[in-house]
Amino acid sequence: MPPKAADKKPAAKAPVASKAPEKKDAGKKTASTGEKKKRTKARRETYSSYIYKVLKQVHPDTGISNRAMSILNSFVNDIFERVATEASKLAAYNKKSTISSREIQTSVRLILPGELAKHAVSEGTKAVTKYSSSTK
């Protein structure tokens, strides 16, 4: 028979021994050392080193500020995103599931104006040829 309301004790915490073992999370204290684990910074991929290398090829004695580098990095990301989006649309129009160099080339011609598109296509073709010959 269940105990009466007056006989019931208030709810207490369960004994420690009966608890399920807890998983250790990053940032919590470890049992052995008592120190917190260091959290690693989230890596941000940028084109800064590549932009800097090109700058030094063109103008060896010229530097660049962090703000200018940030602007150029945003510019490169924007152009890549536009080219990728356009190439994706072209592949979808042609009912293909793979973006090839042809779609990239066509999207560059559509996005970049006149002479800039011609130079970009020729440099891209040169880079693909160089890569293809080095992997053989």
UniProtKB/Swiss-Prot annotation:
Locations listed in the record: Nucleus; Chromosome
One GO CC term, this protein: nucleosome
SUPFAM superfamilies linked to this entry: Histone-fold
Region span, Disordered: 1-44
Basic and acidic residues: compositionally biased ranges: 1-10
Cross-link position per record: Glycyl lysine isopeptide (Lys-Gly) (interchain with G-Cter in SUMO): K8, K9, K23, K24
Origin superkingdom: Eukaryota
PROSITE patterns in UniProt: HISTONE_H2B
GO function terms (MF aspect): DNA binding; protein heterodimerization activity; structural constituent of chromatin
Keyword Hydrolase in annotation: no
Record keywords: Acetylation, Chromosome, DNA-binding, Isopeptide bond, Nucleosome core, Nucleus, Ubl conjugation
Post-translational events: Monoubiquitinated to form H2BK123ub1. H2BK123ub1 gives a specific tag for epigenetic transcriptional activation and is also prerequisite for H3K4me and H3K79me formation. H2BK123ub1 also modulates the formation of double-strand breaks during meiosis and is a prerequisite for DNA-damage checkpoint activation.
PTM-bearing positions, type N6-acetyllysine: K8, K9, K13, K23
Cross-linked residues, Glycyl lysine isopeptide (Lys-Gly) (interchain with G-Cter in ubiquitin): K130
Xref: PANTHER family: HISTONE H2B
Subunit structure: The nucleosome is a histone octamer containing two molecules each of H2A, H2B, H3 and H4 assembled in one H3-H4 heterotetramer and two H2A-H2B heterodimers. The octamer wraps approximately 147 bp of DNA.
Family that this chain belongs to: Belongs to the histone H2B family.
Function as written in the Swiss-Prot or TrEMBL entry: Core component of nucleosome. Nucleosomes wrap and compact DNA into chromatin, limiting DNA accessibility to the cellular machineries which require DNA as a template. Histones thereby play a central role in transcription regulation, DNA repair, DNA replication and chromosomal stability. DNA accessibility is regulated via a complex set of post-translational modifications of histones, also called histone code, and nucleosome remodeling.
Protein name: Histone H2B
Biological source species: Rosellinia necatrix (White root-rot fungus)
Species classification: Eukaryota, Fungi, Dikarya, Ascomycota, Pezizomycotina
Gene name of the encoded protein: hh2b
